[in-house]
Regions:
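Structural preference for solvent-exposed beta-strand-turn elements
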Residues: 1-376
């Protein structure tokens, strides 16, 4: 194999594929990146039996070939190379990377032991890359981090015709985002549970493309597979077993109080007040006509109080939240104004965004957050 490729193109492609390399590969060859040169293109692939990634870039191919080298080492080398064209060639059990006056010789891994990557499933539909990335980020934030509860570490993707709904929960909050897309079949209907971290990493990586193709195969669980493709990059991941709890009935539709606050001063106030909130202690919010009073700490220890302008419709209400979960939600709505809707101080509150304080709420994204019960 002998090829020539631009340094920036090489570094970006290698970094993207190497991101999904396993920290503890189940077999030594799975720590490798597979490089394949043919027909004026150079492809890079990685696979750990769960997630596969592949990207193809234009290259001057002098000699076709395939080689398997240490992925992390190649990524480190590519990052450090000067901004000059890069030549990669193979000779027996060694691969050579030359860039300007830099020359690296790498030992190769046995290509014949590398597993075949799964085939990309048939395309189910397409969505703009920025919409997909935004939706994935808004929902993944509420997914669980506890691997002993694998179902809660996933994002549920539900497809019904031209609507896609993403949902996740860690039992303390529930995030749901809807968006429109272009299905291959107008009557498409499917449900899949995708690892949240994989979904988020993939969505971020595919924002550079105009559109992202989603492709589903299998039963939708366990042995099922989902694929994403865009901007010359494709990745597949096995689906998680199980499904999230039925959540639509958890979201209230009638409220006793609705408060609207400008997001930026609200976020800054929560951050300041939370400085005195010890680990796992809540921030208390008291809504009255025209004002929100935030408090944390106790009279026996450090204490903080702050007032923020707020518009309140309905009854006055006092409620407490985990400040991290509240800030996550305020970050995710990505709107100038935040709307908090309440039934009672002991029931979950619904957070959504508004383009302005006096505008209607955006129902495309909803963040349900459990309150913290206050002693006494």
């Amino acid at each position: 194999m002998k090829i020539r490729v631009e340094r920036d193109v090489l570094a970006e492609a290698v970094a993207w594929v190497a991101r999904s390399l396993p920290a503890r590969p189940p077999a030594p060859v799975l720590a490798g990146l597979l490089l394949k040169a043919e027909d004026g293109a150079l492809s890079f692939s990685s696979f750990d039996y769960e997630v596969s990634a592949r990207v193809s870039v234009d290259a001057e191919v002098e000699e076709d070939g395939t080689v398997l080298v240490s992925g992390r080492l190649l990524a480190d080398i590519c990052r450090a190379l000067p901004n000059r064209p890069v030549e990669i060639s193979t000779d027996g059990v060694r691969a050579t990377v030359v860039c300007g006056s830099s020359r690296f010789t790498l030992h190769t891994l046995p290509v014949e032991e590398y597993p075949a990557l799964p085939q990309m499933p048939t395309a189910t539909g397409t969505v703009p890359g920025e919409v997909f990335a935004s939706a994935a980020a808004q929902v993944a934030i509420a997914a669980g981090r506890d691997d002993t509860l694998p179902v809660l570490t996933g994002v549920r993707i539900e497809i019904e015709g031209d609507t896609v709904t993403l949902a996740s929960t860690d039992r303390y909050r529930f995030a749901v985002r809807e968006f429109l897309w272009k299905p291959e079949d107008p009557d498409a209907s499917a449900v899949a549970l995708v690892p949240a971290k994989t979904l988020l990493d993939t969505a971020k990586a595919l924002t550079s493309g105009d559109t992202v193709t989603l492709a589903l195969s299998g039963s939708g669980a366990g042995e099922g597979l989902i694929g994403f493709e865009g901007a010359g990059r494709r990745t597949t991941t096995r689906l998680l077993e199980g499904d999230l709890p039925k959540y639509r009935t958890l979201f209230p539709t009638e409220f006793n109080s609705v408060a609207v606050i400008e997001t930026a001063p609200f976020v800054e106030a929560v951050k300041r007040v939370a400085l005195v909130a010890e680990r796992n202690t809540p921030v208390r919010l008291s809504f009255e006509q025209g004002v929100l009073i935030l408090e944390a700490g106790s009279s026996d220890d450090a204490q903080a109080v702050e007032r923020v302008d707020a518009v309140l419709e309905g009854d006055d209400i006092s409620i407490a939240f985990n400040p991290t979960f509240l800030l996550d939600g305020l970050s995710a709505i990505d709107s100038p104004a935040a709307q908090l809707s309440f039934t009672t101080s002991t029931k979950p509150a619904l957070l959504s965004g508004r383009p302005a304080v006096d505008a209607e709420a955006d129902d495309a994204y909803k963040y349900l957050i459990m309150p913290v019960r206050l002693s006494g």
